[in-house]
Swiss-Prot record:
It comes from Stenotrophomonas maltophilia (strain R551-3). GO terms for cellular component: cytosol; glycine cleavage complex. The keyword Electron transport does not apply. Signal peptide: none annotated. One of its GO terms (biological process) is glycine decarboxylation via glycine cleavage system. Keywords: Aminotransferase, Transferase. The glycine cleavage system is composed of four proteins: P, T, L and H. The gene is gcvT. This is Aminomethyltransferase. Its EC number is 2.1.2.10. The glycine cleavage system catalyzes the degradation of glycine. One of its GO terms (molecular function) is aminomethyltransferase activity. It catalyses: N(6)-[(R)-S(8)-aminomethyldihydrolipoyl]-L-lysyl-[protein] + (6S)-5,6,7,8-tetrahydrofolate = N(6)-[(R)-dihydrolipoyl]-L-lysyl-[protein] + (6R)-5,10-methylene-5,6,7,8-tetrahydrofolate + NH4(+). Pfam families: GCV_T (PF01571), GCV_T_C (PF08669). Belongs to the GcvT family.
């Protein structure tokens, strides 16, 4: 049965086109995906991401548990509220999910995981947590709104109670704090996102989400759907689980080496496989592609490099760059001239570093000589 967020009627009243996304009835756009993309890059937009899963982890051994569970190291989290992006791996080094974890106390961490992986994630977390005596509590009582764009933070801060505004203004990137709206709604506010823009992701009680959404819109934030969220995250060089990596792909094969912490004395799940991969040299690599010809790069298209064949993982037309962009997984090593098979024609593409766009600006080299 398709699940709905509490904002479902609100989305429909706003004229949203709804689609099934991982078993959830979600808005793909509210009229124009392109306009919503540009609004987030230039002003602000709000996404309903309440389909994602919030999990609270508690216990005296929660930190040792997470040191074992995650490829990135929670030892990096020294200050309450700080967040960490990490992959959770299986014993073969494949990615069970990518997630964000927040350090809220020595015996309390909060995790946000993907919607499509909810059941397997919860089963895996509970299995791995049991020997550590850590409780795994899903929080279906919390909704999530992502308010993103250059104006997003100022608007949200303007809706907070006076006593919290200074702390919210000073809140650093990849950090969170507990605050209240000026009408008393409890808000867990994180300076994180999935768009390449500044902004907040806000966890709040389900029974308050419609009212707070309406206040955001009244303050000038425009609704944005999953279509714009996808083009924004792709421009920002951010992976989508299930499309860019899965349980058969290691972080090293998904351009996520920066999320792997091979710190001494920490035996995390999958570490031995990653160390062997690193020593041998990865068999595959994930690269960024830009197509200067008119057209769109799409998932599944064949990619040819000097090292052999690969394929496009995520591909789209970039509204910011007005070019086709993509992630591709190809054989490791020298790439040479790279081409993509588009309807039987080998079309040349350029290899560029991620991200394609950061805070509204094309990154060096992405636009080429033009």
């Amino acid at each position: 049965m398709t699940q709905k967020t509490l904002l479902n009627d609100t989305h429909r009243a706003l004229g949203a086109k709804m689609v099934d996304f991982g078993g959830w009835d979600m808005p793909i756009h509210y009229g124009s995906q392109l306009d919503e993309h540009h609004l987030v890059r230039r002003e602000s937009g709000v996404f309903d991401v309440s389909h994602m899963t919030v999990v609270d982890l508690r216990g005296d051994q929660v930190k040792p548990f997470l040191r074992r569970l995650l490829a990135n190291s929670v030892d990096k989290l020294k200050v309450t509220g700080k967040a960490l992006y990490s992959c959770m791996l299986n014993p073969r080094g494949g990615v069970i999910d990518d997630l964000i974890v927040y350090y809220l106390g020595d015996d309390f961490f909060r995790m946000v995981v993907n919607a499509s992986t909810r059941e397997k994630d919860l089963a895996w977390l509970r299995e791995q947590a049991a020997p550590f005596g850590v409780t795994v509590e899903q929080r279906p009582d919390l909704a999530i709104l992502a308010v993103q764009g250059p104006q997003a933070r100022d608007i949200v801060i303007g809706l907070a109670r006076e006593a919290d505004r200074a702390a919210l203004t000073k809140l650093g990137r990849f950090a969170a704090l507990q605050a209240q709206s000026d009408d008393g709604i409890e808000l867990f506010v994180a300076r994180t996102g999935y768009t390449g823009e500044d902004g907040f992701e806000i966890l709040l009680p389900q029974d308050a989400v419609v009212a707070f959404w309406n206040r955001l819109l009244a303050a000038g934030v425009k609704p944005a759907g999953l279509g714009a969220r996808d083009t924004l995250r792709l421009e920002a060089g951010m992976n989508l689980y299930g499309q860019d990596m899965d349980e058969a792909i290691s972080p090293y094969e998904a351009a996520l080496a920066w999320t792997v912490s091979l710190d001494e004395g920490r035996d995390f799940i999958g570490r031995d496989v990653l160390e062997a991969q690193k020593a041998a040299g990865n068999a595959r690599q994930m690269i960024g592609l830009v197509m200067d010809e008119k057209g769109v790069l799409r998932h599944g298209q064949a990619v040819t490099t000097a090292g052999g064949q690969g394929e496009i993982l995520s591909g789209t037309f970039s509204p910011t760059l007005a070019k086709g962009i993509a992630f591709a997984r190809v054989p490791a090593g020298e790439l040479g001239q790279v081409t993509v098979d588009i309807r039987g024609r080998q079309v040349p593409v350029r290899v560029v570093k991620f991200p394609f766009v950061r805070e509204g600006q094309a990154q060096p080299g992405v636009l080429g000589d033009a």
